[in-house]
């Protein structure tokens, strides 16, 4: 899958201190892909990643209706149970 980062996503990488290689890994091999309830063009790629002794859920919002796919926004959270579908 080919993808690019939107300007906003690039800004979020810096603002949230996210590592690009981790984001790339999640997009290329996500543990889950869920639909965005508000926008059918957006798929949310997510994976649980351990950093130091803390588990984070990386959530990458990707516009899958355009080529190349566009990473619209992204973040990581410790609220895994809220978003991760088991």
Could you describe each region identified by the protein language model?
Residues 1-86:
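Ribonuclease/tRNase effector modules and their secretory precursors
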């Amino acid at each position: 899958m080919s993808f690019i980062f939107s300007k906003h996503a690039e800004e979020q990488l810096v603002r949230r201190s996210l590592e690009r290689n981790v984001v790339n890994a999640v997009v290329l091999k996500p543990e889950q892909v869920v639909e965005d309830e508000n926008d059918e063009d957006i798929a949310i790629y997510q994976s649980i990643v351990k950093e130091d002794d803390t588990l984070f859920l990386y959530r990458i919002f990707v516009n899958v209706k355009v080529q190349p796919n566009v990473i619209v926004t992204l973040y990581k959270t410790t609220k895994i149970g809220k978003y991760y579908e088991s």
